[in-house]
Amino acid sequence: VSRFERLTVTMISDQAIAFQLYQNRELDEIDLNESTITTITSDPNNEYNSQLCEKRARPSAYAMHFNYQKNNADGTPDVNWNKAIANTAFRQCFYRGLNLKAWFSRYNKINPLKCENDYYTMKGLCYNTQGAEYTTLVAKEMGFDGEAYDGKTMIRLRSNNGDIADLKKQAMDELSAIGVTFPVHAAYHIIAGSTTALDTATVLKQCFTDSFGDDFIVLDIKTYVSS
């Protein structure tokens, strides 16, 4: 026996539209875009403040990969970037200095550092023949095995408190000597027409500014069209 006389399926293309539907009580739960989250969390008296909750994490892990042979739009090699990313000190600036806490807040505004993952897979996915979980083994090799979530500082930034002044100087000196010009531009592509993707990328761009300084590395937000 059918429980409903009519069922409506709504395809939502944008989180701003989803929020409007939530306000009209047409949706029970939604993800929020950056501007809406900021509006709600910045005002303790906002009517939706008490309705915020952590979203259950997806059983997956995401990773950023460097392109060591980047080409320009015309097909010619991006020599400036390719030289920069081949430099060890330059790459270590990402590892030891890029603070992504604000970016993680796009996915978990309440406890952003729960999104931190310094390993290639999510926790609990892989085990060796002795039953040891993969990420615990990697943490030991990286010197992280004594570190735990504290809700304040990313694990990989704790050894130097995110201070990369010496590494930055080293990278800039070494790269300037081989003709690299600054700032180095890092390209980050998002799907065209998505305000959610743009909000998230804009936060990431600010993370680059705060962590590196715009005199060193600048994130360029690029778009692609899904076919």
Short names for language-model regions:
Residues 22, 27, 46, 210-227:
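Periplasmic binding protein-like
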Residues 84-212:
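Append "and occasionally in soluble cytosolic enzymes with long acidic Gly/Pro-rich linkers
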Residues 4-6, 24-27, 61-63, 87-91, ...:
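Extracellular structured ligand-interaction cores
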Residues 4-10, 182-193, 218-220:
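Short, well-ordered beta-strand elements
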Residues 70-90:
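Short helix-loop capping/hinge motifs at secondary-structure junctions, enriched
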Residues 42-49, 73-80, 171-179, 209-214:
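Alpha-helix termini
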Residues 1-3, 169-170:
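The feature preferentially marks the first beta-strand/turn patch immediately downstream
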